[in-house]
UniProtKB/Swiss-Prot annotation:
It comes from the Bacteria. NCBIfam families: mono_pep_trsgly (TIGR02070). Its EC number is 2.4.99.28. It is an enzyme of class 2 (transferase). It holds the Pfam family Transgly. The chain crosses the membrane at residues 12-31. Peptidoglycan polymerase that catalyzes glycan chain elongation from lipid-linked precursors. One of its GO terms (cellular component) is plasma membrane. GO terms for biological process: cell wall organization; peptidoglycan biosynthetic process; regulation of cell shape. This is Biosynthetic peptidoglycan transglycosylase.
Amino acid sequence: MLQFILRRIVKALLWFAAGSVLVVLVLRWVPPPGTALMVERKVESWVDGEPIDLQRDWEPWDRISDNLKIAVIAGEDQKFAEHWGFDVDAIQAAILHNERGGSIRGASTLSQQVSKNLFLWSGRSYLRKGLEAWFTMLIELLWSKERILEVYLNSVEWDEGVFGAQAAAQHHFRTNASALSVQQASYLAAVLPNPREWSASHPSSYVSRRAGWIRQQMRQLGGDEYLQGLNSSRRW
């Protein structure tokens, strides 16, 4: 009986592994039709009795402002071009910070955030962390860095029910994702840790200070030259 159960478990795991590889491989070229986070937001709105219409328009890489690409990297994951999905230094720093009793600090890379947004539910558990690591590894192995950032910019939430760069640009600044200025991009990047509480178009003093810091980091990263290096940094 035990051997039968173990065989069933192994078979299920193999099917899951093969299926997830296939899905991630397809999404290397095909825009995701939606994300787990979008489904979660929809369900939350129904449960609360206040259904919302999600705002989202997919924009390809070359129709998203380079300013926004650099701003997001500057604010969220400055080692994006270097790591394979996990920033070990940031993880260690977050663990030390949290052990000292400070406010909870995360250390998720852009690749990890893509994994969570696309495939996983909110919350904290060992199962979810394990699945996040699995999908992050697949994304890093099967996608280019450019593709990871493209999917991130089209799936991240920028306000209640507002997903992706184009919807965010329209919602906050009444412009297109391709036309975002350095200042606008820095404000969008500044709210990403908490986009449902902070506003890019009506920023608090903290968000304004964070946006200023992000603009400094953008200059230090090198702007367009950084993106050119990002495009050529991939293994295959």
